[in-house]
Amino acid sequence: MSHRRAVFAAVLQLIACSGGTLVAHHSFSMFEMDKNVTYEGVVVEYMWVNPHTHFTVDIKTGPDVDPATVGRWDVEGGSTNIMARQGWTRATLKPGERITLVGHPMKDGSKGISLFYMIRPDGKRLYHDIARPKDEASQ
């Protein structure tokens, strides 16, 4: 086998072996990204982990709450790196804190939300990512 073919075969093998990791990260296609909902709730758990931060919130009130939405919700944020650039830390949330969530609901209606931003009791907004309205860039 020529050197060129050996290199080509090695590259193909490397691509084939890493294929699982290339597609392992899910997209946000499970969320209704063109729809925002607002819920108020109490933090149950906050997980500062990669690939996405997660927290669990007991939802009881909010402008978009009906009896079907009351309950424990899983909230998905960005990676710890992305969240840190938005002002989040490992200590941002504590169980028992009351917060307001604005985000994108699951398409299948299950109790999950992709975070757009959170409003703390002091009124401060913390965003999931850098995408935010220009008039709120300094908040």
Placement of each model-derived feature along the sequence:
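Bacterial N-terminal signal peptides
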Residues: 9-21
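Short nucleic-acid-contacting surface segments enriched for D/E, G, S/T with interspersed K/R
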Residues: 85-100
